[in-house]
């Protein structure tokens, strides 16, 4: 077991641990993708193992599916589950209205499909992910490989009429080749610095031929759980306006840390 977690990993663990407390027996769950979501999967597996919690998980990526299966969580497809009680996922950024940028892990398409097929979406994040305005993190846009350069030009043209501070568009690479999503598509990263009207931008991007989906999640997230490096955690619900503060006992994490290889 590692001697001590870094403050950022402590924050991610704290958020994940608190969010998993929302899971009830018999639920069908959307399992997010990314480093914070991986903590959530481990925390969920601990409850399955120690409490006999019965859940079905719908992963949002191949790597999440592999982790969930390895830890003993029952994995099903969204077609098998049909509808979900709860999705727990991370975010690259979120604002005061719980609008999100997601897709840093290149799983934005499945993440958005799963989140919108859920009664509730809970986002888990460290405090650094909260921003006044979206856009400092590059906005991912998933595009069809065929004619991607033409699609890129249309995106750049669309950005000319948008309230953004930057307009650079780059193809995401894996080594020297384009990164491929689980659906074998490409990712274009939009370096916008600040997005003034995220709803308008999201709608405009999805009207472009060749665009599959974009990483703006608008009116999808219901609850945000924010972790801090000292183990503090806050839960905020958009609909009720309520906020809860708490503290995660890091000593309880020993059996989770034990299965970490790095």
Swiss-Prot record:
InterPro entries: NagB/RpiA_transferase-like, Ribose5P_isomerase_typA_subgr, Ribose5P_isomerase_type_A
GO molecular-function terms, A-Z: ribose-5-phosphate isomerase activity
Record keyword Transferase present: no
Catalytic activities: aldehydo-D-ribose 5-phosphate = D-ribulose 5-phosphate
BP terms from Gene Ontology: D-ribose metabolic process; pentose-phosphate shunt, non-oxidative branch
Binding-site list for substrate: 33-36, 89-92, 102-105, 129
GO cellular component: cytosol
EC number: 5.3.1.6
Pfam families found in the cross-reference section: Rib_5-P_isom_A (PF06026)
Keywords: Isomerase
UniProt function note: Catalyzes the reversible conversion of ribose-5-phosphate to ribulose 5-phosphate.
Family stated for the protein in its record: Belongs to the ribose 5-phosphate isomerase family.
Subunit note: Homodimer.
Protein name in UniProt: Ribose-5-phosphate isomerase A
Species whose genome carries this gene: Cereibacter sphaeroides (strain KD131 / KCTC 12085)
Gene of this entry: rpiA
């Amino acid at each position: 077991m590692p001697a001590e977690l870094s403050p950022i990993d402590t924050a991610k663990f704290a958020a994940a641990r608190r969010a998993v407390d929302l899971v009830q027996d018999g639920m069908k769950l959307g399992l997010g993708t990314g480093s914070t979501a991986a903590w959530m999967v481990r925390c969920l597996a601990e409850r399955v193992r120690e409490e006999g919690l019965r859940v079905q998980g719908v992963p949002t990526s191949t790597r999440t599916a592999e982790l969930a299966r390895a830890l003993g969580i029952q994995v099903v497809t969204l077609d098998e589950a049909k509808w979900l009680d709860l999705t727990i996922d991370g975010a690259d950024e979120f604002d005061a209205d719980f609008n999100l940028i997601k897709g840093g892990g290149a799983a934005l398409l499945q993440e958005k499909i799963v989140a919108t097929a859920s009664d509730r979406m809970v986002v888990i994040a460290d405090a650094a992910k909260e921003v006044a305005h979206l856009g400092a993190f590059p906005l991912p846009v998933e595009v069809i490989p065929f004619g991607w350069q033409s699609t890129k030009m249309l995106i750049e043209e669309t950005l000319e009429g948008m309230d953004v501070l930057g307009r650079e568009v780059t193809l995401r690479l894996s080594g020297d080749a384009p990164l491929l999503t689980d659906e074998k598509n490409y990712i274009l990263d939009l370096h916008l610095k600040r997005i003034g009207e995220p709803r308008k931008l999201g709608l405009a991007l999805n009207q472009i031929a060749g665009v599959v989906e974009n990483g703006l999640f608008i009116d999808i997230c219901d609850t945000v759980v924010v972790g801090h490096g000292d183990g503090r955690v806050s839960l905020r619900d958009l609909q009720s306006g309520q906020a809860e503060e708490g503290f995660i006992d890091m000593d309880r994490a020993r059996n989770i840390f034990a299965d970490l290889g790095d």
